[in-house]
Amino acid sequence: MTMTNEEMVAEIKRLQKERDAVIMAHYYVPAEVQEIADFIGDSFFLSKKGTELDCRTIVLAGVRFMAESCKVLNPEKTVLLPASDADCPMAHMATVEKIKEQRKLHPTDLAVVCYVNSTVEIKAESDVCVTSANAVKVVSRLKEHYIYFVPDQNLAHYVAKQCPDKEFIFNDGYCHVHHGVSVEDVKELKAFYPNAPVLVHPECREEVLALCDHIGSTSGIINFVGTSDAKEFIIITECGVGHELTERYPDRTFHFLPMERGEKDTKGGYAMVCPNMKKVTLEKVYSSLKNNEEQIGLTDDLMARAAAPMEKMLD
């Protein structure tokens, strides 16, 4: 017998109590999943919040690297990934071999800085992890001169501009959702909504960042809206954040890519949608709790090596 959404939500709540489980969701997952989560946030918030929870089980409604990060920081807890096929392509755009090559080239004055959007194997080979929310602060405090920043090239270029005393070695990884935004996409939105500040995630390309009024992580974008007097905003990041923005600021208007199909819009345009985040459905959260799967399993050695750079990120 098929359950209604209301029945499924009730069953999820019952299973949470039974398993002593907390649901944490990323801003990019579907709205129906965000609505049943105990906590919603970006990668940095979810990493930090997981360490503060008093529970036996964490359901990580996001992609695989987030669940792995949660397990590394909470080795004693059961961490469940509802959508086992929800992976981040960028997380695999760095290799252990390339890290070792750079360490040979710069044996004494190199820091490997790992964006949290990476596999646990890459984290284990790094000196420190960062998120888009704290990357500039963390890198600026490092004593090393050479910075090998993996895996995202666009965030690396943004951080490099804020840390001119460092010499960056760039990897060639990218987030396909943010990297795909063009200057033309942003200019078209600006032409339609000239009074709307443009808020951009630093995973976008440099030429796109140059057009914006504010650069920030997902949480940074959300917080900026709260400090602004503007009534409408152009949001250049994954469209899932629109749920939190409209919930928190119901009196504001938000414009995403693609543009709304209305009188002003003639072509639709590039869509900022992460297909992997959208794999995390209400049904999969229910199934995950019901069957206690997929449990994230990592070796003790791998978790220990990845924990050191991740804990520095939280300091």
Task: Show the residue positions of the predicted features.
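Active-site loop-to-helix "anion-binding N-cap" substructures in soluble metabolic enzymes
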Residues: 1-236, 241-315
